[in-house]
C-alpha cells in the first residue's frame, strides 16, 4: 500500500493546538456533512471546526508549515498545493462511513489525503481509520502528532467511536505528479540517492542519479 506515517507535530505543538480548539464555542463546530460531497454526506457523522475561524486559519498555517519543512513528506508527496485543512472531532457513536474523496474541490485537486492525530489513541475506543485497496484493508490508529498520507483514490472510512473523543486534523495535497505509481518511482529513486549520499558522500555517479531524478520530475510533473 502506498502510504506514509511520520511524526509531524511534537507534544508542545499538539498541546497548543488543543488549547486553542478548546476555546472554540459550540457554534464554531459544524456538522461535518457541510463539506462532504453528495454521496459521502450520507455516511458522514462528525463535527468540524468552521474554517473561517481564526483558530482554524492559524493552526492550518502551522500544519502547512510543518508539512513543507519535512523532507520525507515532500519527497513522498511532491506537494504543489496543500489545501482544505480542517479540524474534526468524533464523539461517542460518531463515524465516517466508507467513501471516496472528491477528486476536485474548490480549493484544489486531491491527489493525497492526510490525517494528523491530536488525541492519545488510548483515550478513545474505536475510531480507527480504514484504508482499502483492491486486495487489502488496513486499520490505523495513530499516536499523537503522527500524520498518515495516502492516495485520495483509495476508499476509506473511520470506524464508530465507542467511547471518548477522536480529534484530528485532515487535509489534501495536490501533487506535481498526480500518478500514485509515478510518485512511488520518484520517491524510491530520491530515497536511494539520499541514502547513498549520506553513506558515501558526493560522487560523479550520484550527480547522474540526481540529474536523472530532476529531469524525470521535470518531464512528468505538472
UniProtKB/Swiss-Prot annotation:
The GO biological-process annotations, alphabetized, read as: DNA damage response; intracellular iron ion homeostasis
Is Mitochondrion there in the keyword field?
no
The protein's enzyme class: oxidoreductase
Listed binding positions for Fe cation are 99, 101, 156
Q: Domain (Fe2OG dioxygenase): give its ranges.
A: 81-175
Q: Is Cytoplasm found in the keyword set? A: no
Q: Which cofactor does it need?
A: Fe(2+); L-ascorbate
Output the Gene Ontology terms for molecular function. 2-oxoglutarate-dependent dioxygenase activity; iron ion binding; L-ascorbic acid binding
Q: What is its EC number?
A: 1.14.11.-
Pfam families the UniProt entry points to: 2OG-FeII_Oxy_3, PKHD_C
What are the annotated disulfide bridges? none
Q: Which residues form a coiled coil?
A: none
The alphabetized UniProt keywords are:
Dioxygenase, Iron, Metal-binding, Oxidoreductase, Vitamin C
Q: Where does 2-oxoglutarate bind?
A: 166
Q: How the cofactor binds, per note?
A: Binds 1 Fe(2+) ion per subunit.
Which NCBIfam families does the annotation name? PRK05467.1-3 (NF003974)
Concerning PANTHER family, the annotation shows:
PKHD-TYPE HYDROXYLASE YBIX
Protein name per Swiss-Prot or TrEMBL: PKHD-type hydroxylase P9301_13621
